[in-house]
Amino acid sequence: MTGLDMEIIFAKIKEEYARTDDVGKRQIQGHIRELQVGFYSDWDVVMRLSSGPLQVALTKVGIDLGIFRSLKESDTPITLAEIVKKTGASPRLLGRILRTQAAFGLIKETGPQEYTSSAFTDVFANSDAAGAVVQLFDISGPCTQILPDFLAERNYQDITSNKDCVFQKAFGSDLTMFEWMPQHPKHMESLGHLMALERPVSWVDHYPVLEELGGFPAPDKVLMVDIGGGFGQQSKALRAKFPDLPGRLIVQDIPQTLANAQPAAGIEFMEHNFFEPQPIQNAKFYYLRHVFHDWPDEQCVLILKQIIPAMGPESQILIDEMVIPSTGVPWQAAFTDLLMMNSLGGVERTRAEWDDLMEQVGLEIIQSKVYDSKEQAILVAVPKRT
């Protein structure tokens, strides 16, 4: 087979990938992973797998030194000498780092000691993607490293407490991660970037907002309370999708998070701890994205109990979370589930687990729609009819 034949095959795969749906994309990704393993020797498989932590570490080094941003912003390749001048790093050390980054595809080598951006470079030049890497490396990394020992010490029993999970052992602290984070502003900021990292699919494109509103909207009423909403990215998406929709949008989060939020037209920010009574009464939507997966069931029950008394007869709780299928769980969903377990004693839930959680507080799920290939879904909960 010639090089031209290979290019034709690759082009065909790219063409098929571009036109298929999310399920098809996931299947292609899976086939490519299987194909890679089939081409590797046992040594290759071990080395490839074991290189993962180093790749993440080199990504963080690239972020810390501003390498990715410099390469992305340059119209021409940049030499090692130029990067040394910008960073002040040792030429020999930086040369070894750059060539390894290039070997992993994090940057692209164009000649001897000369580099330009790759597709990965462009991703990590994005401030939200860079912040997400920092958060995952600094917080999730140490937890992942000691997970095997932690599980063995506990005789492989379930983790159900955010005060007794891998995080406490990894960081030598009696605090939960969310108690520890406000004492470390750098990590609060990187967590905000992780939350703000754009997903290619949004709930606003899949939930029938207008149909559900009916005659509810009015300029003086609260359309949505975005609880634990971070920088307000989901409220901003709703406002962008429906710019003329009347009603107030209120983003609630703790002060340390809101300190890094940027003002936005038509969006209000309010300091609020969701373990305290919900102060906004009779909103149409009480929206929570990626809140419940951070917490064991006991705390999730407390969060819901703060919202229910504030609900009016037309109110709905919108839960934007994964719904784990019984088989064929996407790697992104399975990965996130264990990250939540390690750091927070949290969990990505199945539909049965969601139903059980709602049952504990007298709610029922009246709608459920999975809207992307990672099993992200909108669950609509209301007080159970008697």
Curated annotation (Swiss-Prot):
Residue positions of the active site: H293 (proton acceptor)
Activity at various pH: Optimum pH is 6.5-9.0.
Cross-referenced InterPro entries: COMT-like (IPR016461), O_MeTrfase_dom (IPR001077), Plant_O-MeTrfase_dimerisation (IPR012967), SAM-dependent_MTases_sf (IPR029063), WH-like_DNA-bd_sf (IPR036388), WH_DNA-bd_sf (IPR036390)
Keywords: Methyltransferase, S-adenosyl-L-methionine, Transferase
Enzyme class: transferase
Binding locations of S-adenosyl-L-methionine: G228, G229, D253, N273, F274, R289
One Pfam family this sequence matches: Methyltransf_2
Metabolic or biological pathway: Mycotoxin biosynthesis; aflatoxin biosynthesis
Enzyme Commission number, as recorded: 2.1.1.109
Keyword Methyltransferase: yes
Gene3D superfamilies, per database record: Vaccinia Virus protein VP39 (3.40.50.150), Winged helix-like DNA-binding domain superfamily/Winged helix DNA-binding domain (1.10.10.10)
Any GO BP: aflatoxin biosynthetic process
Positions that bind substrate: F137, D138, I139, S140, G141, P142, C143, T144, Q145, I146, L147, P148, D149, F150
Region feature (Substrate binding): 177-197
Highest taxon of the lineage: Eukaryota
Catalytic activities: 6-demethylsterigmatocystin + S-adenosyl-L-methionine = sterigmatocystin + S-adenosyl-L-homocysteine + H(+)
GO molecular function, one term: demethylsterigmatocystin 6-O-methyltransferase activity
Role this protein plays: Demethylsterigmatocystin 6-O-methyltransferase; part of the gene cluster that mediates the biosynthesis of aflatoxins, a group of polyketide-derived furanocoumarins, and part of the most toxic and carcinogenic compounds among the known mycotoxins. The four major aflatoxins produced by A.parasiticus are aflatoxin B1 (AFB1), aflatoxin B2 (AFB2), aflatoxin G1 (AFG1) and aflatoxin G2 (AFG2).
Record-stated family: Belongs to the class I-like SAM-binding methyltransferase superfamily. Cation-independent O-methyltransferase family. COMT subfamily.
Protein name listed in UniProt: Demethylsterigmatocystin 6-O-methyltransferase
Species name: Aspergillus parasiticus (strain ATCC 56775 / NRRL 5862 / SRRC 143 / SU-1)
Name of the encoding gene: aflO
